[in-house]
Amino acid sequence: MSRDLPAGATPHTAQSVVNAVQGVAPAMEIADDRNADYTQLARLGLYLVADNAWNEGAMLGRFDTRWTRWLTTPEVSADDGLGRLRGEVFINGASVGGGQGRDLMGHPLKALAWLANEANARGEQLHAGDVCILGSLVSSKFPQQGDVLRFELESFEPIELTIT
């Protein structure tokens, strides 16, 4: 984040958070599901995200600070370049899923606005320097020791992680 996103007179929107984003990068989140009851996720999933409940860490690729070139429509849209950005995850060379930026609540900036508003509702805020993981293009995977995970996000260098 390039600047704080405090509560304001009106809620944050995808359009209003554009200037708060310093850069965009591919990421793989390391999660610990703590033996969760997956039947409850449909009801509680967004709150788990807002609470950072399962995050054990993340592997980040190179940040692109010229990311606004993907905003190819006058308003933030699922059809702009960021909404159409494609990514795919591989385990040991086999594809295990993929998606597009629009899979993150309709657009990554909509996910960021939601996160900022949720933080504000709790009396908190996103801060300059924060790194925000906004969602996933694939469902959770459960790699085993020795597996090699690779995330390929269009226009970025791939990132790779070996489970030891």
Protein language model regions, located:
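Short strand-turn-strand beta-turns centered on an Asx-Gly dipeptide
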Residues: 91-93, 134, 154
